[in-house]
């Protein structure tokens, strides 16, 4: 299933190019605001594997779509993208919205392994247009998740705006992710707030000179209904896995003793 939309960011125009019966009520809702969503709360996020104690990692509040806010470890650190895509349901298309400054500073979307036929990409004129496009996209039951990238700390991105996104995500059963590039963690209505950055790759199992699996360090610093924490994660075929942090210590501290 592929859904393509032609959208004039900031102009309030949404035109469906390929009609899809599963999204028809939601498309009508984008234009009239009167349609009811058909989404169910457990469809937008994937909970992978068994419990975390067995080495797998499950997203806090998995199965309960809401608004998550992600802060990049540095303005041009793209590690958050791998962390985010490792959690999402790839069975439905993603709506990915970027404002102009986010594109200029960090580039357009190019996620390896993501079928471009399942990606709806919107280049928004400004942060206000990003918020508008995200809120409208959350009304579509056929969308797997809505991702929005905003650069800096625009005045329009206040508590009320983030609260609106959180309510829309929970009402319609579609997960929303607001990515803050070069932003400050001010007051927000997001239920989950993260700091995510790239971490050293794992050792390659066959070639010690080659990079292994990519890893990310994710800090959950605010959460409703979940304990904050920090994890190092690797994306494997069946989901995100916990990875042990490297320890910098002497051989004596590690328990090794000199013999002979």
Question: What spans do the regions from the language model cover?
Answer:
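A short acidic, amphipathic alpha-helical/loop segment
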Residues: 80-86, 133-134, 161-164
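Long, charge-dense
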Residues: 97-158, 162
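A conserved mid-domain beta-alpha-beta active-site/ligand-binding segment of alpha/beta enzyme cores
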Residues: 206-226
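Detector for small/aliphatic-rich hydrophobic stretches
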Residues: 1-96, 100, 107, 116-117, ...
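A contiguous pocket-lining binding segment that forms or flanks enzyme active sites
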Residues: 150-206
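C-terminal regions of RecA-like/P-loop NTPase motor modules
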Residues: 2, 226-260
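Structural motif
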Residues: 69-71, 95, 144-149, 177
């Amino acid at each position: 299933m592929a859904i393509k939309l032609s959208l004039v960011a900031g102009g309030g125009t949404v035109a469906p190019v390929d009609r899809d019966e599963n999204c028809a009520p939601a498309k009508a809702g984008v234009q009239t605001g009167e349609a009811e969503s058909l989404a169910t709360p457990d469809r937008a996020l994937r909970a992978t594997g068994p419990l975390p104690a067995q080495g797998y990692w499950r997203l806090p509040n998995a199965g309960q779509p809401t608004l998550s806010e992600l802060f990049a470890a540095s303005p041009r650190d793209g590690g958050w993208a791998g962390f985010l895509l490792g959690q999402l349901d790839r069975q439905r298309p993603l709506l990915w919205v970027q404002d102009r400054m986010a594109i200029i500073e960090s580039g357009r979307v190019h996620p390896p392994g993501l079928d471009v036929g399942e990606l709806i990409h919107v280049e928004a004129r400004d942060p206000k247009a990003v918020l508008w496009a995200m809120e409208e996209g959350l009304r579509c039951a056929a969308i797997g998740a809505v991702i929005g990238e905003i650069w800096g700390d625009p005045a329009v991105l206040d508590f009320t705006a983030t609260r609106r996104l959180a309510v829309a995500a929970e009402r319609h059963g579609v997960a929303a992710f607001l990515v803050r590039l070069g932003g400050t963690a001010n007051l927000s209505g997001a239920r989950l707030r993260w700091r995510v950055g790239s971490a050293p790759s794992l050792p390659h199992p066959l070639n010690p000179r080659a990079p292994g699996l990519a890893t990310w360090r994710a800090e959950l610093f605010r959460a409703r209904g979940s304990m904050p924490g920090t994890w190092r994660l690797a994306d494997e075929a069946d989901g995100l896995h916990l990875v042990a942090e490297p320890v910098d210590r002497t051989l004596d501290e590690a328990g090794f003793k000199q013999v002979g």
